[in-house]
């Protein structure tokens, strides 16, 4: 079984000079899910990992360089996630490759990424538009004392069962760390829910308690979804984290209660 420590993370590597789908490094989702009591066969959520690729280049049949940006969507039901550095190296391996057409490139990306993830991956050229302020109400201005920065403390989460609301709460203060290199991962996280009113100060303390936590982006979002669901008992819940770019890629994991459909229109934040 592949582990993060087996990947190219934290190692010096040569940039590829020719196309090589073998550079893609899959990591099973099951290990991290088992740590928080999740079973791949009975997931309590639906969702996807949406990647934005900013550094995509190849050669046309006559050898002229081409460039594009792309949106890649990996279903959360895939048995494996795609490790980010390997994704970057794979895209770079296309730089000197002649490809017949843009559609041929898209089909190649779909084939290779789907094989890595173990499930059908969607690829479309283009990116969502930028939005200056996220949709929802920021909780970052709350006047609170905070002294816990890890590990994540679900005990901070609470909800008032006497008030049932539907709202979207947003924080730009989510930070976690790569479990291999220790590099910081920065994100704005949004929680849209219907149910008992979540205590905002407790939620902010909870999100800040990820600050020294080491876990991949996708795993952090699944942990947040699971712990908010367990502690606050919403009727339904959506959690999305929009991470800042690294190596020409950013990732946006989205998890939601079964029956919730992904928003038809999404956006990128200024930090992305």
From Swiss-Prot:
What Gene Ontology terms describe what this protein does at the molecular function level? Answer: preQ1 synthase activity
Reaction equations catalysed: 7-aminomethyl-7-carbaguanine + 2 NADP(+) = 7-cyano-7-deazaguanine + 2 NADPH + 3 H(+)
Q: Does the keyword Kinase apply?
A: no
Superkingdom of this protein's organism:
Bacteria
State which Enzyme Commission number(s) the record gives: 1.7.1.13
Record-linked InterPro entries: GTP-CH-I_C/QueF (IPR043133), NADPH_dep_7-cyano-7-deazaG_red (IPR050084), QueF (IPR029500), QueF_N (IPR029139), QueF_type2 (IPR016428)
Into which EC class is this enzyme placed?
A: oxidoreductase
Q: Name one GO cellular component term.
A: cytoplasm
Q: Where does this protein hold substrate?
A: 82-84, 217-218
Catalytic positions? Answer: 178, 185
What pathway does this protein act in? tRNA modification; tRNA-queuosine biosynthesis
Q: Which GO terms describe its biological process?
A: queuosine biosynthetic process; tRNA modification
- Tell me the protein family, please: Belongs to the GTP cyclohydrolase I family. QueF type 2 subfamily.
Return the HAMAP family for the record: QueF_type2
The name this protein carries in UniProt is NADPH-dependent 7-cyano-7-deazaguanine reductase
């Amino acid at each position: 079984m592949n582990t993060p420590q087996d990947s190219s993370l934290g190692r010096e590597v040569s940039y590829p000079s020719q196309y090589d789908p073998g550079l893609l490094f899959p990591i099973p989702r099951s290990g991290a899910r088992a740590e928080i009591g999740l079973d791949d066969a009975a997931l309590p959520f639906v969702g996807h990992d949406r990647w934005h690729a900013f550094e995509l280049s190849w050669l046309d049949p006559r050898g002229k360089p081409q460039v594009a940006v792309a949106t890649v969507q990996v279903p959360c039901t895939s048995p494996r996630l795609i490790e980010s550095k390997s994704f970057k190296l794979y895209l770079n391996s296309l730089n000197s490759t002649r490809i017949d057409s843009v559609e041929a490139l898209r089909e190649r990306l779909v084939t290779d990424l789907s094989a890595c993830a173990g499930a059908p991956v969607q690829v479309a050229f283009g990116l969502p538009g930028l939005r200056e302020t996220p949709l929802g109400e920021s909780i970052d201005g709350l006047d609170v004392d905070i002294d816990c920065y890890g590990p994540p403390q679900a005990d901070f989460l609470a909800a008032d069962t006497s008030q049932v609301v539907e709202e979207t709460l947003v924080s730009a203060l989510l930070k976690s760390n790569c479990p291999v290199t220790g590099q910081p991962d920065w994100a704005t996280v949004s929680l849209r829910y219907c149910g008992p009113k979540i205590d905002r100060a407790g939620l902010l303390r909870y999100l800040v308690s990820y600050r020294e936590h080491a876990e991949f982006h996708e795993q952090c979002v699944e942990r947040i979804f699971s712990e908010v669901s367990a502690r606050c008992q919403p009727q339904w819940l959506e959690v999305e984290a929009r991470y800042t770019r690294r190596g020409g890629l950013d990732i946006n994991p989205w998890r939601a209660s079964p029956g919730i459909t992904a928003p038809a229109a999404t956006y990128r934040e200024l930090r992305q």
